[in-house]
Amino acid sequence: MASKVTDARDWYQKKIGAYDQQIWEKSVEQREIKGLRNKPKKTGHVKPDLIDVDLVRGSAFAKAKPESPWTSLTRKGIVRVVFFPFFYRWWLQVTSRVIFFWLLVLYLLQVAAVVLFCTAQSPHNIPLTEVIGPIWLMLLLGTVHCQIVSTRTPKPPPSTGVKRRRKLRKAAHLEVHREGDGSSTTDNTQEGTVQSYGTSTSYSIGAVFRDIWHAAFFLSGSKKAKNSIDKSTETDNGYVSLEGKKTGKSSEECAQAQERLCEVIKPEESGWSTTTMRETFGTPSHHKETHRTVTNLSDEVSSEEGPETGYSLRRNVERTSSDGTLRNRKSHHYKKHYPLEDTPKSGTSCSSRCSSSRQDSESTRPESETEDVWEDLLHCAECHSSCTSETDVESPQMNPCVKKEYRDDPFHQSHLPWIHSLNPGLEKISAIVWEGNDCKKADMSVLEISGMIMNRVNSYIPGIGYQIFGNIISLILGLMPFVFRLSQAKDLEQLAAHSATELCITAFGSNGDILVLSMVVISFVVRVSLVWIFFFLLCVAERTYKQRLLFAKLFGHLTSARRARKSEVPHFRLKKVQNIKMWLSLRSYLKRRGPQRSVDVIVSSAFLLTISVVFICCAQLLHMHEIFLDCHYNWELVIWCISLTLFLLRFVTLGSETSKKYSNTSILLTEQINLYLKMEKKPNKKEELTLVNNVLKLATKLLKELDSPFRLYGLTMNPLLYNITQVVILSAVSGVISDLLGFNLKLWKIKS
């Protein structure tokens, strides 16, 4: 229905637009329709030695983004929390098995608490907010988690292995046909599979819990899917590279599949000539046989694994098909200077060697995110430099699977142009490093300098003060109902005269009713657990902000000899244009390093929750400030407001300090002074130093133009919505202060 309305709207727009057209506009439209079809074209290359404004701004280092809007993600998060058992597969894939069972127990306990509250007949002093409060917090946490994992949306596996193989084979053939037609590849086939699976499956309550038990204890696909999701990388153009660590079973099956594939395509002789290779790639029978072998092996492997693992293994087998065919190439083919007639017509060996080198390094090194990233970047930078001339010419008869692998490789899509433009032999700067008391010079690239900074940040031992503070607040909020009932029932002097049994009866709000006691205990457990989870997320965000500040501090120490030696980082001066370029690249990369959007979601949720709590408190104070503290939930709101405000102040302090470190133009001004000092000592280099000085001045102006002040909320807020929120909240605070102090006070001012 929506598509028909859209088509009708477009048709009517064109219809009424035709009445306004003149002759010149029609001729222009005819030329626009022709486009570039009749234009002569020749091969061109992007200048690798130039920089874009995206590089300085940081948007060149793309981060993962969700495909759905935040309203859809909020709705999905609420639905997945309310119907938690029915979405057990999704929760198993985006969390671990232990966390899933913990959340399931909390969900069942909360349901039991609501049922007990509704069925309790005896009079009790338990307010409704004590039972309903954890539900709102559970919905908030579920929504936040759904927005965090929205960039990695796993798809449930089909019901049977035969249907899975059939649909995977169909999807593979459709992808090949789309590749041959030159059209863009989408996930329509997979989406259709998921939709048909979701609509054709109906569960009873007993079947749901039986499937939960079976999935948690007897299926390993969710664990593998989680590993592949956690290790995947995605950019703005929708690329997903699943490089998760495989279990022993999947690794053995993949190795066997690779051995069988290599036996099929292995030549009878030890070496092939270039002519033989060209004939082999040009033979249609060999092309079809190889593709059929890859498809069969991928179907065989994926029939026993989960969807994400099967996808990874299929990509692995496809890499092996290209690598096994090309690996007997002689070493002189990779030299930069060779005759054109000896040049192979395929550019996939670079991608194959890059992928295999990354897999080999992943199997031997420890599990570290930093090492994984830098190994990938270093291997692919070397691979790119060795295969630059080889990838200039592409074969029109390339294997579609290999061409898809080559096209989907993120290291060949210029997502990191400043890395790929670096030649390891040329794009280096002379930096000073300290080994004890010895000062030595070394030629270092951007990757090596940033790697040393990251190692220094990772070696930093974070404090646990805010974690302890979160634990204390969780316990206080959990015990608040008991303390409030004791304070309302008895005076402090009378409490000492009562026995422990009477105090417990008063604190639990019942005279021994087992249903009420169970409800209070369950609410206490659920409340403490959910509040602890929320403050745990805030502690994770606080640590991330602290790491960003450390990145900024160490980056500022690079151009200071004393601070660089103290911080054990390299030291170099901005005395050349190349040094300035690498300094700007390093600055942008470090600003984008680490969690970005996920942490912004947590901080934004805390910010919006604080605004809501402050607004409710102000409304309660304006409505009934005489009896404000006589309500249990008002005490909880005050505690929430104080604790969240402390965390937000911490975020504001760290974020503002980080922005100040990166926007510190005193470094560039100091380097300009050093250039003038160098001009005085070396008049013969005055022209060169003047050029560098002018570039420094331009860099200073550019940073001032692009840098923006720190924002507490990570989500983009409409200016109108921001002004409305500011007016409502600050007006409420102004009203409270004016009512309590007795004079008018305005704290807000609308800004355009």
From Swiss-Prot:
It is a multi-pass membrane protein. GO terms for cellular component: endoplasmic reticulum; membrane. Residues 173-194, 227-251, 273-371 are annotated as: Disordered. InterPro entries: PHTF1/2 (IPR039775), PHTF1/2_N (IPR021980). It is found in: Membrane. The keyword Transmembrane applies. Its main location: membrane. This is Protein PHTF2. Pfam families: PHTF1-2_N (PF12129). Residues 359-368 have a biased composition (Basic and acidic residues). Keywords: Glycoprotein, Membrane, Transmembrane, Transmembrane helix. Residues 6-153 form the PHTF domain. Residues 346-358 have a biased composition (Low complexity). It comes from Gallus gallus. Glycans are attached at N296, N664, N723. The chain crosses the membrane at residues 98-118, 126-146, 464-484, 520-540, 601-621, 635-655, 727-747. PANTHER family: PROTEIN PHTF2 (PTHR12680:SF2), PUTATIVE HOMEODOMAIN TRANSCRIPTION FACTOR PHTF (PTHR12680). Residues 182-194 have a biased composition (Polar residues). Residues 327-337 have a biased composition (Basic residues).
